């Protein structure tokens, strides 16, 4: 039997890829990779681009950002330079994504020269420095105001209470501090060094930005960026279009690329086939981003790194480092990819052939033209005949030809003004080559004596030639012997960076600090992510069984909160094991944070008012505004109903709401009290303006050393009753978080809200800090969770108190920052002793299971609520709900207390009450927001929701807890429409 052998490895290598299994495996792998890319793209941020883009432009933006963002090209509207505008939006988002951000907040970022309305509408934590340098900037601000108004009118609830964060100062003058910054096409007027100085003024260490870029700017006087359809051109002044005609070779030979002319050279950017506004900038500023590498200023060294250059846009980053920088050679290069197919040709720039200039010509065109010129050259022919031959070949290589009815571009078109001079230069170059070759041949073929004489006489000939060129410059045309110039495809820059910044930068300590800070923020972020995941994965809770009826027993309110007698007020408090030094450090840190917070609130108020004043045409010299103030203030009035203008005649632009009194105003003199004869502007922050005083006073106080005790009790556990029983006028003072709580405690204690005794012993924390007050040994604090820990410490320090006994519910609404950009870390109370009270005497019996059910749905898994024990109230069923079609169907009963989650719903109820001619006391005292009603107790309460648009407050356990625990007898929830995630509406039917 015959046998045969074969090499299995060779067969697999040659035929393996043709097998069905191999093809199927490749298809499966390709499908998985495509699916992963698609899923990644779907998870990316959705970016909607309304500009109409053609196919080529769409590919440009998808290639650059399609892998990072889920791009939706809506093709809705034609816009000037549409691709540039679309790229600008993606560049802004890309630069912001470079910096740290969490699900809770984004670290504050500065935007030098950016569009503040873009950040405002998207909710970015960004402060824009948008100076009004001219009419163009003011036009842009006016358009942004209109855009903001347009969006807010369509969805006012989303922007309720939100203010745009920007100023009209230059980047170097603004005082807002942030570690990070962006500059989207904002560095043209500042230059590299200007950006570095602005970063230094803001304490910024990293900046990421973009700008239009074309390497040919270093060589040419004009050029074209094809992707952006942008033509750039250097001009010598803002009012002259004369081009910069300096020899390009001289520019390349200069290592520093000095100015083209002694005067200022500008560069203009024009968009082709678009009769829109162009941009003109100082060429030196733009050039600095290409030539400069480092800059040392005010103890910091800044270095620029060019990251990505695509579609005519360069993305760069500038990083600032402190301390000493030892000597180091920094090298970078700028590439000219468009130069590789070109050669420089010197052509006459004047009729006397004294001035010459260099033009670019396609290498293939010059090579073929010169080849034919060399072959056809004949010194016996008339020069005109040779010139015509060269022009004919040059024309055929740089014109449009028609073949079989189809037009084709041969080579590249030559400038009409240079066409004849290029041909003439090629003729001179050809003739010069033949003459040089002839001299070389004659020298090679000459006798020995002639060669010796030529070599000996050469120094004399060179000397006399130099003298003639100096004395008679017009006799130089024959000396132009180098017609061809080799164009480099790149240019390099070498710079030695060395800076003595004093003390060395301790990178290790900085790394430890950043790591600790990031762990704290990451922990909070992880908790929020876990909470959101629990909401998505929560299994529907089974219906709560009815609670067995509790036999009513009389309860002595004096024993509430576990306080049997006055002497045993803190028997159940557990002492904490923290050292006194650690306690003082914590309190001092909290006080510093609170003072910084109040200062930022004051600075923000001044900045907002200054921005409005400048937008309306005011300045810091004259007490006057321009004629467009109505448009400006109508736009701001749609966001803040307390924005207004006071005229010198005493008239207001808008009627002042009843009960509102402005304590300060703003004009060219700044923020402060104003006279009736002055022109000034106001907003909601001018009603009570005490942030600067609180900052100054808190900063001057030392951290207290006394003991802080906390009674953490549920709603209705008798906290106010306990305060009444413990209060001793000789040693105590009662402190509340707000004026409404102070009035409630005064009435409960003294049966009066304005008597001398009531106002002396029950005061708000702000009142104690801002006014004179006697020293006491003990402070009783009501609703302490509404106070910043630093403010509580400041109150104790000013009163010289040795003990603070604080009452509150840690699960209810806590102190929250009014400035989203402020990094709040130490606002939560850190007590030395704690005690819990989990029995409610106010809430009916069905409230506790309702609260437990809401906690199950809203709080992270494993988190328990204090509302675990039953209620001591005799009322068993109190909670109901019903749907209403509109505010007109909400029953306004003077015997009921009405609460809302938002100020907008509160305003609607007040308007409805006025339409029904209800007493003023009703809509003034008995219609409040949930936040305002914390600490209030009423018999009958109605919660009203008039909109079904997204509102996160209905998902927050703390707000819903306050809402359902204000009543003693009945609670009714009236709502318009279905709201997804409405915690109260979802839980009431299950109780």
From Swiss-Prot:
Region (Methyltransferase): 52-409
Gene Ontology terms for molecular function: ATP binding; helicase activity; hydrolase activity, acting on acid anhydrides; mRNA methyltransferase activity; RNA binding
EC code: 3.6.4.-, 2.1.1.-
UniProt KW Protein transport keyword: no
Region (ATP-dependent helicase) location: 711-973
Taxonomic placement: Viruses, Riboviria, Orthornavirae, Kitrinoviricota, Alsuviricetes
Protein name, as recorded: Replication protein 1a
Function, as annotated: Involved in the virus replication. Contains a helicase domain and a methyltransferase domain. The methyltransferase domain is probably involved in viral RNA capping. Involved in the formation of ER membrane spherular invaginations in which RNA replication complexes form.
Domain (+)RNA virus helicase C-terminal: 838-991
Membrane topology value: Peripheral membrane protein
């Amino acid at each position: 039997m015959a046998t045969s052998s074969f090499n299995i490895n060779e067969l697999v290598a040659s035929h393996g890829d043709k097998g069905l299994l191999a093809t199927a495996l490749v298809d499966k792998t390709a499908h998985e990779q495509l699916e992963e890319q698609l899923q990644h793209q779907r998870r990316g941020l959705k970016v909607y681009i309304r500009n109409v883009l053609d196919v080529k432009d769409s590919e440009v933006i998808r290639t650059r950002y399609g892998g990072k963002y889920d791009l939706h090209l809506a093709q809705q509207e034609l816009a000037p330079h549409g691709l540039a505008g679309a790229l600008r939006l993606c560049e802004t988002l890309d630069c912001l994504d470079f910096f740290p951000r969490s699900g809770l907040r984004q670290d504050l970022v500065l935007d030098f020269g950016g569009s503040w309305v873009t950040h405002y509408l998207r909710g970015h934590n960004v402060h824009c420095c948008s100076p009004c340098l001219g009419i163009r900037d003011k036009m842009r601000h006016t358009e942004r105001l209109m855009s903001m108004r347009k969006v807010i009118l369509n969805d006012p609830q989303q922007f309720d209470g939100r203010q745009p964060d920007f100023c009209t100062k230059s980047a170097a003058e603004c005082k807002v501090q942030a570690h990070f910054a962006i500059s989207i096409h904002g560095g043209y007027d500042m230059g590299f060094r200007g950006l570095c100085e602005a970063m230094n003024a803001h304490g910024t260490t990293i900046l990421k930005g973009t700008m239009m870029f074309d390497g040919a700017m270093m060589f040419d006087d004009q050029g074209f960026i094809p992707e952006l359809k942008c033509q750039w051109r250097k001009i010598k002044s803002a009012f002259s279009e004369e081009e910069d005609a300096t020899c390009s070779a001289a520019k390349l030979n200069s290592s520093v690329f000095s100015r083209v002319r002694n005067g200022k050279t500008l560069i203009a950017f024009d968009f082709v086939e678009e009769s829109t506004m162009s941009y003109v900038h100082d060429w030196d500023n733009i050039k600095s981003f290409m030539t400069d590498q480092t800059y040392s200023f005010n103890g910091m060294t800044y270095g620029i790194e060019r990251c990505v250059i695509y579609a005519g846009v360069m993305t760069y980053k500038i990083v600032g480092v402190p301390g000493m920088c030892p000597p180091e050679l920094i090298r970078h290069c700028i590439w000219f990819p468009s130069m590789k197919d070109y050669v420089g040709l010197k052509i006459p720039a004047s009729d006397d052939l004294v001035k010459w200039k260099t033009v670019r010509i396609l290498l293939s065109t010059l090579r073929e033209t010169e080849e034919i010129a060399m072959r056809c050259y004949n010194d016996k022919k008339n020069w005109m005949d040779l010139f015509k031959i060269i022009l004919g070949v040059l024309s055929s290589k740089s014109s449009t030809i028609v073949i079989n009815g189809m037009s084709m571009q041969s080579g590249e078109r030559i400038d009409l003004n240079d066409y004849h001079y290029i041909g003439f230069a090629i003729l001179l170059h050809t003739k010069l080559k033949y003459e040089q070759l002839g001299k070389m041949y004659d020298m090679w073929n000459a006798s020995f004596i002639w060669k010796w004489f030529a070599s000996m006489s050469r120094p004399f000939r060179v000397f006399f030639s130099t003298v003639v060129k100096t004395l008679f410059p017009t006799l130089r045309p024959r000396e132009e012997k180098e017609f061809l110039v080799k164009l480099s495809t790149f240019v390099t820059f070498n710079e030695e960076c060395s800076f003595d910044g004093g003390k060395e930068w301790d990178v290790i300590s900085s790394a430890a600090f950043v790591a600790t800070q990031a762990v704290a923020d990451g922990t909070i972020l992880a908790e929020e992510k876990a909470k959101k995941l629990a909401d998505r994965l929560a299994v529907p809770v089974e219906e709560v069984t009815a609670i067995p009826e509790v036999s009513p027993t009389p309860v002595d309110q004096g024993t509430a909160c576990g306080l049997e007698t006055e002497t045993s007020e803190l028997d159940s408090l557990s002492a904490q094991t923290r050292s006194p030094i650690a306690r003082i450090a914590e309190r001092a840190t909290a006080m510093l944070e609170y003072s910084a917070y109040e200062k930022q609130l004051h600075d923000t108020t001044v900045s907002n008012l200054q921005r409005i004043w400048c937008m309306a045409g005011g300045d810091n010299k004259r007490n006057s505004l321009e004629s467009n103030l109505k448009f400006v203030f109508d736009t701001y009035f749609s966001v803040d109903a307390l924005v207004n203008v006071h005229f010198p005649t005493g008239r207001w632009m808008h009627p002042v709401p009843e009960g509102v009194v402005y304590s300060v105003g703003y004009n060219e003199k700044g923020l402060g009290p104003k006279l009736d004869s002055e022109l000034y502007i106001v907003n909601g922050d001018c009603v009570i303006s005490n942030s600067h005083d609180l900052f100054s006073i808190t900063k001057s106080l030392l951290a207290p050393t006394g003991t802080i005790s906390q009674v953490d009790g549920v709603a209705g556990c008798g906290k106010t009753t306990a305060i009444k029983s413990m209060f001793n006028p000789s040693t105590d003072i009662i402190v509340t978080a707000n004026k409404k709580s102070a009035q409630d405690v005064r009435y409960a204690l003294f049966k009066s809200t304005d008597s001398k005794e009531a106002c002396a012993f029950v005061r708000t924390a702000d009142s104690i800090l801002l006014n004179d007050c006697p020293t006491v040994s003990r402070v009783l604090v009501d609703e302490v969770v509404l106070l910043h820990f630093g403010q509580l410490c400041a109150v104790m320090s000013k009163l010289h108190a040795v003990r603070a006994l604080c009452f509150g519910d840690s699960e209810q609404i806590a102190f929250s920052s009014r400035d989203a950009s402020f990094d709040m870390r130490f606002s939560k109370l850190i007590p030395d002793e704690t005690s819990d009270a989990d029995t409610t005497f106010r809430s009916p019996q069905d409230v506790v299971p309702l609260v437990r059910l809401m906690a199950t749905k809203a709080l992270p898994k494993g988190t328990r609520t204090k509302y675990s024990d039953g209620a001591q109230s005799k009322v068993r069923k109190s909670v109901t709900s019903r749907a209403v079609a509109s505010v007109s169907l909400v029953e306004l009963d003077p015997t009921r207390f009405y609460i809302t989650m938002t100020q907008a719903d509160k305003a609607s109820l007040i308007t409805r009450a006025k339409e029904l001619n209800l007493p003023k006391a009703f809509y003034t005292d008995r219609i409040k927001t949930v936040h305002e009603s914390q600490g209030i107790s009423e018999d009958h309460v109605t919660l009203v929701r008039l909109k079904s648009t997204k509102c996160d407050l209905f998902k927050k356990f703390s707000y819903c807890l306050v809402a359902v625990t204000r009543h003693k007898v009945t609670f009714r929830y009236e709502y318009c429409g279905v709201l997804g995630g409405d915690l109260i509406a979802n839980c009431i039917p299950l109780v």
